[in-house]
Amino acid sequence: MAIYERIGKGYDLTRRADPYIVSRLNHYLKVRANLSYLDVACGTGNYTLALSQSGGTWHGIDQSPRMIGAARKKSDAIFWQLADVTRLPYRERAFSGVVCTLAIHYFIPLSSAFNEIYRVMAAGNFVLFTSTPEQMNGYWLAEYFPEALHQAAEQMPSLEVVNDALSGAGFHSMQTENYSVQEDLQDLFLYSGKHRPAMYMDAAVRAGISTFSLLASTTEIEDGCGKLDSDIKTGRIKDVIRKYEHDEGDYKLIIARKDAT
């Protein structure tokens, strides 16, 4: 995840905790005031801060010094740590819940990360917000940035792979909830412009999205933006968006349980 050193600068210009996503994470975490919680791959701490408003003692870890540095400037009420998810600096059963948003595709191997998260959890839920390759293949962005979207989808572990790694670590009772991007989404991650295609014409927005800043070539961005701009002006974009409509959600909440031992 040290690759986020490359996009950390200016990250908070377009990335912020979305209230609806926070509400769904809270729903499954079931935060209690006297317990401790961990945000894994917390980035600049946007979701950590938002979730901490519900109570509890919060910790956030990230592998990027730039991201953790930005998080530390936002709050000294949260315990921020520069750390690798496969070697967490905590004792066993330290946390009553763990959350991770849009980061598990950087956990290599996935099993090592989930084993560590299981180790530091007491009874509680591990709540993930992610997308699957199947969902990403349904993004209309593939019409304009096919190679970058293909690479991004290939990075994502399938739901089957995630569930196998979770059960292998000891978690059980896995459940999922699909999330479809809404027009008022405040966190400008990859498919946040689903209903607002002109958003992708903004270089600042693209800079905060790893698919564009880390995977897409300059030529693909220039060509894709040119085609997208033309389709927005002619109205063809509406037909493109309709072609990619589906009911499988754009992202997914995955919830796994650990019982008291």
Label every model-predicted segment.
Residues 175-261:
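Conserved Class I S-adenosyl-L-methionine
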Residues 1-35, 46-50, 67-70, 74, 126-157, 187-191, ...:
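Conserved class I S-adenosyl-L-methionine
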Residues 99:
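A conserved beta-strand element that flanks and buttresses the S-adenosyl-L-methionine
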Residues 102-105:
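Short catalytic micro-motifs in class I SAM-dependent methyltransferases
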Residues 154-170, 176:
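Short alpha-helix
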Residues 38-40, 44-87:
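Class I SAM-dependent methyltransferase SAM/SAH-binding core
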Residues 111-124:
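A short glycine-rich, Lys/Arg-flanked "PGG" loop and its adjoining helix->strand segment in the class I
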